Every structure is written in structure tokens, then in C-alpha cells.
Swiss-Prot record:
Localization annotation: Cytoplasm
One Gene Ontology term, aspect cellular component: cytoplasm
InterPro entries documented for this protein: AceGlu_kinase-like_sf, AcgluKinase_fam, ArgB, Asp/Glu/Uridylate_kinase, Glu/AcGlu_kinase, NAGK-C
Binding site for substrate: G64, G65, R86, N180
Uppermost EC category: transferase
GO biological process: arginine biosynthetic process via ornithine; L-arginine biosynthetic process
Name the UniProt record assigns to this protein: Acetylglutamate kinase
Family per record: Belongs to the acetylglutamate kinase family. ArgB subfamily.
Catalytic activity: N-acetyl-L-glutamate + ATP = N-acetyl-L-glutamyl 5-phosphate + ADP
Pathway: Amino-acid biosynthesis; L-arginine biosynthesis; N(2)-acetyl-L-ornithine from L-glutamate: step 2/4
Highest taxon of source: Bacteria
Primary residence: cytoplasm
Keywords of the record: Amino-acid biosynthesis, Arginine biosynthesis, ATP-binding, Cytoplasm, Kinase, Nucleotide-binding, Transferase
Taxonomic path: Bacteria, Bacillati, Bacillota, Clostridia, Lachnospirales
């Protein structure tokens, strides 16, 4: 088939999705290996900019864990984790704020180089992310926060003024102390608070598998009932377990669809949002209305 015609058909395939998600808020949790490769990083930012230009309202919540670990090590400290959460003493907290601030402004610069306005904030700005100390099995792991409230005023103002908000996951407690917040938790809380249509987690895995040992069992559309079943039967473990629980919480709190995508895949957001087949796993409510082509892809 003529290559130009193929490109035209790709645009036509995207049309119903562009129409459906026009003016809808979409939260992208950006992290993993896609942050470490400049080419992948540019692809992700191009995708986010295109979402904005076709009428969606993207918000980026980013991590920076690997970069934080690097700088903690350079300062002669050791990174420690409990249940996947970074033990954060005063030195580590200072490093986290420094590194996340650097990452944040770098992402702002990349977006603006592509002709779209962006503003980088941390959860401290406008008291956007209010938190309390997080305990893990009763253990104090330092300045690690559990989000208690999301104040959306600043985010809403930025969106209304045509900016892409880019949020670093640092929060404040009631005494105005800064806390490091897990970026997945922050993305989930933000998407719920702003009434997002979609939340996309960029990870280092394709999505959720029916059988983790068999990569051909990727689930394209996963209902909450089936997700709960996979967890209860022990099919979900490791880092995917808290991530899938976050997805379930977000959908139960009103987010229409939560996507788990391989951020190492070129233009993963566009392929998931604007093509019939998609490339990752979409978690939906049990009674969600499916697109016509999805009826045979649903698990649950």
C-alpha cells in the first residue's frame, strides 16, 4: 500500500479517540528507563506535546529515583529501601529536592522547545500535595510522605492558562516540613483529584500478563474484577503489585482508564491512546463502555 495512504489511514484511525478525549485531562506518570535515554525522553515529551496540540489537557508527574540514588552515592551515602520506598533522612531529602527540581526544569525546557508552554512545580507550590509521615509496617522511614489531600487550585490555573503542569512529587505536612512522595502515589492522587479521564504509568514492562512467565499473555483490557482476581491468586508480584493497586484505586475513585505502558517503546502514549490495538494494559471499571474493537480484548 502507498506509504502516504498508510499515514492517512493512521490519522483516520486516531480521529474517534481525538474526538472522545478532546478537552479531557490526562495524567502521565513519567519514570523508569525512559527518563535515562535522551532519545526515549524526547519521544515521550513529543507524545505529551501532541496530546496537548490535539485538544487534550496533559499533566506530567515525574519521578527521578535512579538519579537520586546516583547523587546519594556520590555524597558517600547508601540508598536504602523498605518495601520499595526510599528511606529518606535529612541528607537524602535535600538530595531528592535538588535532583527532582533539576529534572523538573529539564522537562519544562524540553516541552517549551517544542512550542508548548509548561510550568514546573513541586507539590510544595500552592500546597498542592499535602501529606503526613508514612509508616511502613509501623517503621519510621524518615521524610517519606503519604498524601492526605491534593489542592488542585494551582494545577487548574495552569491548565486554564494553556500551560502543561509538570509536577515533582514533594509534599508538605501540616508543619510545612517537606516530604518525599512516591511518584506513582502522587500521580494516582493527582489524577483522582483533578477528575482525569486517563492516567498512564510509563514503566519498564509492557503491561499486565495473565501469566507473568509467558510474554504472549499480555492483557489489553483488564477489569477491576479480573485485576483483583490476579492479585488474590498470586499472579502479580514485585514492583507490579503496588502499581496495579494504585491503578485499581484510581479507577475506583473515578478515573475512567488507567494504562500501564512500556516507556521504552517509541511513542508509547500515541500508540496506546490513538490506535485500535494499543500496546499496553488498560485497567477499566467492570461496567465501562468499551470501544467497538475491544469486545474481544477484555479480561474480566
Amino acid at each position: 500500500m502507498d506509504q502516504i495512504l498508510v499515514k492517512a489511514q493512521t490519522l483516520i484511525e486516531a480521529l474517534p479517540y481525538i474526538q472522545k478525549f478532546n478537552n479531557k485531562k490526562v495524567v502521565v506518570k513519567y519514570g523508569g528507563s525512559a527518563m535515562l535515554d535522551p532519545e526515549l525522553e524526547l519521544n515521550v515529551i513529543k507524545d505529551v506535546v501532541l496530546l496537548k496540540l490535539v485538544g487534550m489537557q496533559p499533566i506530567i508527574v515525574h519521578g527521578g529515583g535512579k538519579e537520586i540514588s546516583k547523587w546519594v552515592s556520590l555524597l558517600g551515602h547508601e540508598s536504602k529501601f523498605v518495601d520499595g520506598l526510599r528511606v529518606t533522612d535529612e541528607v537524602t531529602m535535600e538530595v531528592a529536592e535538588m535532583v527532582l527540581g533539576k529534572v523538573n526544569k529539564h522537562l519544562v525546557q524540553m516541552v517549551q522547545q517544542l512550542g508548548v508552554k509548561a510550568v514546573g512545580i513541586s507539590g510544595k507550590d500552592g500546597a498542592t500535595l499535602c501529606c503526613e509521615k508514612k509508616l511502613v509496617n509501623g517503621e519510621d522511614i524518615g521524610f517519606v510522605g503519604n498524601i492526605s489531600e491534593v489542592n488542585t487550585d494551582l494545577i487548574d490555573t495552569l491548565i486554564k492558562n494553556d500551560f502543561i503542569p509538570i509536577i515533582a512529587p514533594i509534599g508538605l505536612d501540616k508543619n510545612y516540613m517537606a516530604y518525599n512522595i512516591n511518584a506513582d502515589d502522587a500521580a494516582c492522587a493527582v489524577s483522582t483529584a483533578i477528575g482525569a479521564e486517563k492516567l498512564a504509568f510509563l514503566t519498564d514492562i509492557e503491561g499486565v500478563y495473565q501469566n507473568p512467565e509467558d510474554k504472549s499473555t499480555l492483557i489489553s483490557v483488564l477489569t477491576l474484577e479480573k485485576a483483583d482476581e490476579l492479585i488474590q491468586e498470586g499472579f502479580i508480584g514485585g514492583g507490579m503489585l503496588p502499581k496495579l493497586k494504585n491503578c485499581i484505586d484510581a479507577v475506583r475513585s473515578g478515573v475512567s482508564r488507567v494504562h500501564i505502558l512500556d516507556g521504552r517503546r517509541e511513542h508509547c502514549l500515541l500508540l496506546e491512546f490513538f490506535t485500535n490495538k494499543g500496546i499496553g494494559t488498560a485497567i477499566i471499571n467492570d461496567d465501562s463502555i468499551l470501544f467497538e474493537h475491544e469486545s474481544g480484548m477484555k479480561e474480566g
